[in-house]
Amino acid sequence: EEHLKELLECGIDVVTLGNHYAAKKEIFNFIDQYDCLLRPNNLHESIPGTGTNIFDCNGVKIRVTNLLGKAFMNGVIENPFDNIQDILNYEEKADIHIVDFHGEATGEKYALAYAFDGQISALLGTHTHVQTRDYRVLDKGTAYISDVGMCGSYNSILGTKKEEVITKSWTGLPVIFEQVEHGDCLFSAVVLEFDDSSFECLSIEPIYEVVGEEEL
């Protein structure tokens, strides 16, 4: 919870989770207290928290939805296609609807984006930690990227110490991964531009910036 509070104090409005949503069991002690903390929406209905919500941004209603992909993922995961359709059919309408699709398979991400092209404002892929270069606005107006990328250590393997990942990959032995806490940092993100009146998505642009430790 202290990490969540720190992010919110930095000016972050919404935090979306992914397949490791339950890695720290303590999250279930406070997840219902924060409307801005979204776990995947297509989990079993008994799991605490929510995965979609509307936020007011200077009078503009922005819905953010967090979903898990089914391809190569473990656990009980409901169909993400049905889940989005239910949101569109039964939930309150918003001016802008951004979907964070946390999944392994690029094909599944493309399929979901094309299936709801023009019905959601943006589908932003996450999970692989590596930013892709396929950002675009689809024919009917939905912004898309297969993976936004990560924020973390630049000289690492997906944010963890290189030596540990190499050992596990080489020998197959179990290894406890540790995050790199010092050195240059990588900041990955995207910027979405919307029309002020129609809320049509005009563009999506990636940010991929390496920041030296001395600049932090």
Over which residues does each language-model region extend?
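Acidic, metal/ion-coordinating pockets
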Residues: E1-L216
